[in-house]
Amino acid sequence: MTTRRAFVQPAPELLALGGAIRHLRRERELSQEALAFAADIHPKHLSEIERANKDPRATTVVRLADALGITVAALYDLSEAHGDGKPPT
């Protein structure tokens, strides 16, 4: 017998944070592998964060911000400014 999991919509904050990280990564022309290496996390974990499937720890957010060359505050500001998870225009 298998149990089906109901689809749960990711929290808007996670969508926004993941979208901001993806936007900055692409803007800097970094692959997921390159950013993950620089932030000392697994590329699969970065993919999950960008897709809002994982809620990163504070230490992971700090490492990602450092690897992207911005402050954590700037990363959160960008995610708040574009809260829909889509790249800024």
Which role does the model predict for each range below?
Residues 2-27:
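A short, Lys/Arg-rich alpha-helix, primarily the initiator
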Residues 2-3, 66, 76-89:
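Short, charged recognition helix plus adjacent turn
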Residues 19-38, 63:
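Short basic helix-loop element that most often maps to the first helix and adjoining turn
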Residues 34, 45, 55, 74:
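Residues in the helix-turn-helix
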Residues 40-54:
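Recognition helix of helix-turn-helix/homeodomain-like DNA-binding domains
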Residues 53-66:
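Short, basic-rich loop-to-helix N-cap that marks the start of a DNA-contacting helix
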